[in-house]
């Protein structure tokens, strides 16, 4: 190989290295296997109730693969290298389904083709904020539908979940996992009341902190 030829190639190689894109990082809201004793198979809180999360709606602004961060000045930033492994609405639905199934001892991802579940769940998220190094926030309305003693029952509730987070995207993702788990806990409380024959009421959500 001649020296002039190498001289011509070197700038091209250096330019290619300088322009290499940053690696993408993928995140999920689906938590690892729970180790909470309250979720153990022999827990008295389990109901073995067939429950299905049928639909989860997320604001269009954040229902995407890219993570969307909220700034202090009201601006938002689209993080092209910090990605959810699936669109955010699917991530929330999968995480909710898993958390509720673990709480109640029901089948994970109940197949509605097997017949109507005892309780169907629909969730509409009105606000989902991600503030790096500060908080993860979810405001949502959820609706339960069930049949008991030939009666059609419906319960509509509002919920709020706020989790402080540390620095880094991993901490932010864990904060959202805790927020989703908090909503799943509230839904599970109402399902347990129905299963026990009690009054079907909305649980009392935590009060929003002052930001």
Show which residues each predicted segment covers.
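Extracytoplasmic/secreted envelope proteins and their assembly/folding machinery
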Residues: 89, 93, 97, 101, ...
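Generic beta-structure capping elements
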Residues: 54-56, 70-72, 143, 147, ...
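Sec-dependent bacterial lipoprotein signal peptides
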Residues: 1-17
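Surface-exposed short loop/turn segments
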Residues: 20-38, 44-47, 98, 102-150, ...
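A structural "domain/chain start" motif
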Residues: 19-88, 196-211
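Compositionally biased, intrinsically disordered linkers/stalks adjacent to structured regions
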Residues: 174-211
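Short secondary-structure boundary motifs at beta->alpha junctions and helix caps
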Residues: 75-83, 149-189
């Amino acid at each position: 190989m001649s020296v002039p030829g190498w001289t011509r190639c070197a700038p091209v190689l250096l330019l290619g290295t300088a322009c290499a894109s940053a690696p993408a990082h993928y995140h999920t809201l689906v938590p690892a296997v729970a180790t909470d004793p309250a979720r153990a198979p022999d827990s008295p809180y389990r109901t073995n109730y067939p429950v299905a999360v049928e639909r989860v709606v997320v604001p269009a602004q954040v229902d995407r693969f890219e993570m969307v961060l909220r700034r202090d000045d009201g601006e938002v930033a689209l993080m092209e290298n910090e990605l959810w492994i699936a669109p955010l609405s699917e991530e929330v639905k999968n995480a909710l389904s898993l958390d509720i199934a673990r709480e109640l001892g029901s089948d994970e991802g109940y197949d509605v083709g097997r017949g109507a579940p005892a309780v169907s769940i629909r969730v509409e998220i009105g606000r989902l904020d991600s503030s790096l190094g500060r908080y993860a926030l979810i405001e949502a309305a959820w609706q339960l539908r069930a049949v008991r003693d030939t009666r059609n029952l419906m319960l509509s509730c509002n919920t709020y979940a706020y989790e402080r987070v540390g620095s880094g995207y991993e901490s932010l993702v864990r904060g959202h996992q805790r927020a989703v788990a908090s909503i799943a806990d509230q839904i599970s409380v109402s399902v347990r009341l129905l299963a026990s024959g009690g009054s079907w009421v909305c649980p009392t959500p935590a009060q929003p902190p002052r930001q």
